[in-house]
Regions:
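Binuclear metal-ion centers of metallo-dependent hydrolases, dominated by the metallo-beta-lactamase
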Residues: 1-7, 84-85, 111-184
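Core dinuclear metal-dependent hydrolase active-site scaffold
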Residues: 3-85, 176-184
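Alpha-helical scaffolding within the catalytic cores
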Residues: 76-80, 106-112
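Active-site neighborhood of phospho(di)ester-bond hydrolases with catalytic His/Asp-centered motifs
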Residues: 71-76, 91-96, 102, 121-127, ...
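Extracytoplasmic/secreted cell-surface and envelope-processing proteins
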Residues: 100-103, 132-134
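Amphipathic coiled-coil/heptad-repeat helices and related helical stalk/stem segments
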Residues: 56-57, 106-107, 155
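A conditional alpha-helix N-cap/helix-loop micro-motif detector
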Residues: 52-54, 103, 152
């Protein structure tokens, strides 16, 4: 069981979970369906509707190791000031659905995540549909897929523009099915 702010030591790794906020869906129906009553009363046996799954809690994970540190911000939600002063080399930045948000929200999200931690590398995550085949393009035909990818061009342009403002930051995407070494 995770406790916000309580570090877990696993060998050379220290993992500190931080309770966070989930991305706020601008669509009231999606809020009601996915964020309200987030408990799943009994095990789900696929195939089931994507809306049978609930979002539950959102967490940020800070992982430190003698070779470097990284932060996993799984959702495009945030708690103002929460990440201030953290030492982070790489951030895995959850940006799913952020293209459907306002420009002000995107700027505030950037300021409260990347702006607070000043990482050397930003790796966007949680932006695909989560439903496409592993050997094909990551797309899907369900409603959530359309939502997550909505504004994808705008999201990518936003990330590139913000990263370009700071030459010390590199924006990188992960290759599929290839080993990635964060800290050589």
């Amino acid at each position: 069981i995770l406790h916000s702010g309580q570090p877990l030591v696993l060998g050379a790794f220290t993992i500190t979970p931080l309770a966070s906020r989930h991305f706020q869906f601008p669509d009231p129906e999606m809020v009601a369906t996915m964020l309200t009553d987030a408990e799943i009363p009994e095990p789900l046996v696929p195939p089931v509707s994507a809306f049978d799954y609930k979002l539950g809690e959102a967490w940020v994970l800070h992982v430190s190791h003698p070779k470097g540190s990284f932060l996993i911000v799984g959702s495009a939600g945030f708690i103002p000031g929460q990440l201030a002063g953290m030492d982070v080399d790489v951030v895995f930045l959850g940006v799913g659905g952020i293209g459907s948000q306002t420009a002000d929200y995107r700027m505030q999200f950037w300021s409260e995540t990347v702006g607070r931690i000043s990482p050397e590398r930003i790796i966007p995550i949680h932006w695909d549909s989560l439903t496409g085949p592993l050997d094909g393009p990551m797309t899907g035909e369900i409603r959530i897929a359309g939502f997550l990818s909505r504004g994808a061009d705008e999201t990518l342009a936003f990330l590139k523009a913000r990263a370009a403002e700071n030459s010390a930051v590199t924006l990188q995407t992960l290759p599929r099915f290839e080993e990635v070494i964060l800290f050589p």
